[in-house]
Amino acid sequence: MSRRRKGRDVNGILVIDKPQGVTSNGILQQVKRLYGAAKAGHTGALDPLATGVLPLCFGEATKFSQTMLDSDKAYITTARLGIRTETGDSEGAVVEEKPVPQFSEDEVEAVLARFRGDIQQVPSMYSALKHQGRPLYEYAREGIEIERPARPVTIYELKLLAVREQELDLAVTCTKGTYIRSLVEDIGEVLGCGAHVSALRRTLASGYTLANAHDVKDLEAMRERGESLDGLLLPPETALTMFPEYRLSGVPLVSILNGQPVRIPGQPFEGFVRLYGEHSFVGLAEALPEGDGTQLVPRRLVKNSKR
């Protein structure tokens, strides 16, 4: 006898402006309860200290969570100079304090220039990266240091917003897997005084910005007034706007819906595409060159009554 699913079918993406002091999973569970949803997930955790853009996927949208996780991110952060902590942020114990010289903007810019573009970054011990099946932060809490190889990341933008006596405000746009705490610590090391993250706000994730984000308190207020929250959901395909649109109909569409690749003659192209039928979004497909044409391979398909 199959187990009955708890909750209702909810499909779409909700962008939350995560408040400080709570975990991403805590927010996910809270919003999932508000929707009474059977299935939901987030697309990359923010530290409890951090605020900002946290996309949540419901139902069919969870099929694209990995693609969303792989997207570029943007942040605004405050680096507190002169203090290093265990965790690289203000929640960790202080491990070193140094005097902070009076840096000019030109001096800071010269250091920031070293971190723009393709760089190698050693992840923080207080990260969720796994080692032998356990997240690194568990080892760190036990006082165990694990050797971590440097990983390539790209810093598209590293903009100095403000210089104060003991703080720097920075805007960062970067590839997935970039640790802002590690970036700030490395900048502090080159400056010679050390640094940690005292504030962090994510402004972009999976193509969504703060303009798309909702406050959980507003959702709770809507529920108390008896209003439906479903109208706040964005269609799953809005998370895939980095890929071009491609439309199919007839026999090729039927083949794709049955999970079979189709050949598109005379149209050589490659890469992922947002696939649409005659009426609606179908899913994510990958175009592979084949002779003078293209083979279109379904990768993630959504359930939909209208095609």
Swiss-Prot record:
Catalysed reactions, semicolon-separated: uridine(55) in tRNA = pseudouridine(55) in tRNA
EC category name: isomerase
Enzyme Commission number, as recorded: 5.4.99.25
Positions annotated as active site in the UniProt record: 47 (nucleophile)
Gene Ontology BP terms: mRNA pseudouridine synthesis; tRNA pseudouridine synthesis
Coiled-coil regions listed in the entry: none
Summary of the function given for this chain in its UniProt record: Responsible for synthesis of pseudouridine from uracil-55 in the psi GC loop of transfer RNAs.
Family indicated by similarity: Belongs to the pseudouridine synthase TruB family. Type 1 subfamily.
Entry protein name: tRNA pseudouridine synthase B
Organism: Marinobacter nauticus (strain ATCC 700491 / DSM 11845 / VT8)
